[in-house]
Amino acid sequence: DLMLMFFTSGTTGYPKMAAHSFKYPLGHFITAKYWHCVDPEGLHLTISDTGWAKAMWGKLYGQWLCEAAIFVYDFDRFDAHDLLPLFAKHHITTFCAPPTMYRMMIKQDLSQYDFSTVQRATTAGEALNPEVFRQFEAQTGLQIYEGFGQTEGPVLLATFPWIEPRPGSMGKPSPLYDIDIVDENGEPCEDGIV
């Protein structure tokens, strides 16, 4: 049975509907447990508007299935200066935000903020440039673990705990999927093809 509908961002044309059944939330267990690394004793924050599928797969379904508490941060316009004190004030342990927000965060003097409760920082939604990865790590001691998902399903590729984060890498396929990168004819590409 149909549970909910999202619309894609329309990257390749008009937005397209993605319909999901009641099995949909179960696919996000891997997102929360093995990419975000949420903990039943922790507090998770994903920054995503509820109009996006990422709100469901980044801060609700998998996280609740893993018994994690969710921190909700609402804003009319994102301001890193307003967000940064909340990590220490509320003891946020896991965090996910789009690369654009990390770019805004590193423009602040991050040494003024306490990230000691944060165990994992993740990102998805667009490419994370290597300079942001390096600056965030240098200023906070935290590496950013990238992932890739779509409106149509859960996380497909991610830097899971058993993978060392590397600037510019989205990680490896989720254990749920066999993933091939194919050329314009649908044929699998060899390793190293860009």
Q: Language-model segments: which ranges?
A:
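Conserved AMP-binding A3 loop
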Residues: 3-27
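Generic short beta-strand
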Residues: 6, 178-179
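Active-site phosphate/pyrophosphate- and oxyanion-stabilizing loops and adjacent acidic/basic residues
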Residues: 6, 30, 134, 168
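Active-site beta-alpha turn of Rossmann-fold NAD(P)-dependent dehydrogenases/reductases
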Residues: 6-9, 48, 154
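Conserved AMP-binding/adenylation subdomain of ANL enzymes
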Residues: 26-43, 50-93, 108
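Gly/Ser/Thr-rich phosphate-binding loop
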Residues: 65, 92-97, 106-166, 178, ...
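Short Gly/Pro-enriched turn/cap motifs at secondary-structure boundaries
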Residues: 168-174
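Conserved beta-loop-beta connector loops within the AMP-binding
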Residues: 180-194
